[in-house]
């Protein structure tokens, strides 16, 4: 009960009593929004027109030489930004195509099953991941490989055992053609290489 009384006293502290303050009550007037037409659009139109006129070259000069030279100037000023835009677009598209061709491979060495989520996010973002399970126990490594196989299957990617405890996860847009290298790692075809 003491806690309840304390809470009521605390509440009463913040609640105003009408008896303590004998202020006359005034009716609350609702403020209605008034719609007033302002000449702001006209001012903005004038600014736009002024900006447009300031960008246009002066063509009202009375000299005939200036009139013949004015169209050349206006043609050169309007044609100049176009090639710059085209060049910029070409460089941007070249940079994007270069970025699309450059692939990165992340190397991860998870220590627990929870660490494998980071590798799954990387593959989901379209990058390759090389996962080394040397710091993980066999049971957790098998569970992680099952999880990674599901992730890669969902993304239409691929998972390959590169060697021992190392697996390569690739997204759908990247293929790995390493049959010869895989056979070397597996211990086959050593007779084709001369040691001496």
From Swiss-Prot:
Signal peptide (UniProt feature, chain positions): none
Keyword Repeat: no
Annotated compartments: Cytoplasm
GO biological process, one term: FtsZ-dependent cytokinesis
Chain ranges passing through the membrane: none
Family: Belongs to the SepF family.
Record HAMAP family: SepF
Cited function: Cell division protein that is part of the divisome complex and is recruited early to the Z-ring. Probably stimulates Z-ring formation, perhaps through the cross-linking of FtsZ protofilaments. Its function overlaps with FtsA.
Protein name: Cell division protein SepF
Organism: Lactococcus lactis subsp. cremoris (strain SK11)
């Amino acid at each position: 009960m003491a806690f309840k009384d304390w809470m009521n006293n605390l509440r009463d502290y913040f609640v105003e009593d009408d008896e303590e303050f004998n202020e006359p009550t005034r009716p609350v007037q609702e403020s209605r929004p008034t719609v007033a037409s302002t000449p702001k659009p006209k001012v903005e139109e004038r600014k736009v027109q002024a900006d447009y006129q300031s960008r246009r070259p002066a063509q009202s000069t009375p000299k005939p030489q200036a009139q013949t030279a004015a169209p050349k100037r206006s043609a050169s000023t309007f044609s100049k930004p176009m090639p710059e835009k085209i060049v910029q677009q070409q460089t941007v598209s070249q940079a994007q195509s270069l970025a699309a061709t450059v692939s990165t491979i992340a190397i991860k060495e998870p220590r627990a099953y929870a660490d494998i989520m980071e590798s799954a996010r990387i593959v989901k973002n379209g990058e390759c991941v090389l996962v080394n399970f040397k710091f993980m126990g066999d049971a957790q490594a098998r569970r992680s490989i099952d999880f990674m196989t599901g992730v890669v299957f969902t993304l239409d990617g691929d998972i390959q055992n590169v060697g021992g405890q190392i697996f390569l996860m690739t997204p759908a847009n990247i293929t790995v053609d390493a049959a010869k290298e895989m056979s070397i790692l597996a211990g086959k075809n050593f007779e084709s290489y001369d040691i001496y």
